[in-house]
Swiss-Prot record:
Organism lineage string: Bacteria, Bacillati, Chloroflexota, Chloroflexia, Herpetosiphonales
InterPro entries: Arg_succ_lyase_C (IPR029419), Argininosuccinate_lyase (IPR009049), Fumarase/histidase_N (IPR024083), Fumarate_lyase_CS (IPR020557), Fumarate_lyase_fam (IPR000362), Fumarate_lyase_N (IPR022761), L-Aspartase-like (IPR008948)
Protein's name according to its UniProt entry: Argininosuccinate lyase
Gene name in the database record: argH
Annotated catalysed reactions: 2-(N(omega)-L-arginino)succinate = fumarate + L-arginine
Entry keywords, A to Z: Amino-acid biosynthesis, Arginine biosynthesis, Cytoplasm, Lyase
Disulfide bonds: none
Pfam family, one: ASL_C2
Family indicated by similarity: Belongs to the lyase 1 family. Argininosuccinate lyase subfamily.
Enzyme Commission code: 4.3.2.1
Species assigned in the record: Herpetosiphon aurantiacus (strain ATCC 23779 / DSM 785 / 114-95)
Transmembrane segments: none
Recorded metabolic or biological pathway in which this protein acts: Amino-acid biosynthesis; L-arginine biosynthesis; L-arginine from L-ornithine and carbamoyl phosphate: step 3/3
PROSITE patterns for the chain: FUMARATE_LYASES
GO cellular component: cytosol
NCBIfam families in the cross-refs: argH
Amino acid sequence: MWGGRFSGSLAEHMRLFNDSFPIDRRLWAEDIRGSIAWANGLERAGILQAAECQELIAGLRQVYQEFEEGLFLPLTSDEDIHTAVERRLGDFIGALAGKLHTGRSRNDQVATDTRLWTLGALKLADDLIRDVQAALLEQAKAVGEAMLPGYTHLQRAQPVLLSHALLAHFWRLDRDRQRLHDATKRVSVLPLGSGALAGTAFAVDRAALAAELGFTSISQNSLDATSDRDYIVEILAAIALLGVHISQLAEDWIIWSSSEWGFVALDDAYSTGSSLMPQKKNPDSLELARGKSGRLIGNLITVLTLLKGLPSAYDKDLQEDKAPLFDAIDTLSLTLPVVAGAIRTARFNTERMESALDDAMLATDVADELVRRGVPFREAHHIAGRLVREAEQRGVGMRQLPAESFVAAHPSLTDVAGLFDFARSVAMRDVPGGTAPNAVRDQLIAAQHVLAEG
């Protein structure tokens, strides 16, 4: 493909070093689609005769069939997917294959292939995330008005509905979906026709190419188009954050599944045992999901570091952009179905959750009631805090303090028995986005609409 300038061949270790076919071979379908569109473009530009174009396309379809059926046999001379396809095309149709690359560079070719592949990968990622969301929504609907302690700093804070806690992860994942969806318009930009860096010298209709390949726009600057990998960074950043959200979900559930908490039990299908300790049931599905987030963050850092030192236009360093992108999508494809399955099959111990609720978690309700009785909140906060301390010193729950303690704390606290009701505390948070049953019902409806809209 490029040997005319050189008098010798590559050293064997340099050939192996330069070879990207093991990585970019998965772009075979996109490469052939792009080549068919390019052949049509060359015909429209008068570079190819109609019969030549038809023969090229027929040959490309033969190559496509070989890949599709797993029959394609690479040669050591196939340094990348582009040379492999063109070489095999030549086997089928002879010298005419040499006309296909007219006006095209591997620089704009690989940029086009990768964008085409990424558009398909974004749809896959969306489906995978939606499935995890659906699993969370199914469980949130099933648990009714079960309550558990809500935690801040891993300390018991206030009671919340279990459904509310589950939906918190739903909305995080929805933001991840939105970020990936928003990136689509920046992926769907056609670089084909940009040549190596200066643009093709032939009058190819780039808008027609974009329409044929399903791109929504064409690039505006050929030098930028051949080196632009912003969209990969953007997608890897969104996926890294998705990984963090999955890790946070996993961390919550790993803690909940411990013997000390006992709030949730994972199904055997998503747990493993110990080679030494027969009693162990480990939440390895979620631990591995938590661990994969580091890999996803690493992929982002790899590409950012790759791009940092590059001058304008294409450099061979960019050959290293695809492995992190492919790995990110592969990791999601492996991880998210496991997470969805672990969620769907989990069993919640709602009695254990509700038994973990304690009176101190209602201290805010005492302060809120004082505010309703005309006490400034800061003073009310201080009064409630003193009552918590007194209960701790006596070794009792707040509700077990004598009536005199409440009246001594503030004269208005003459009837407080009704405050020590966890269901009441939850019901009082009846604002949009709150944990009250009414608010959570609205949230469930909103979540259902999000999934229905696709």
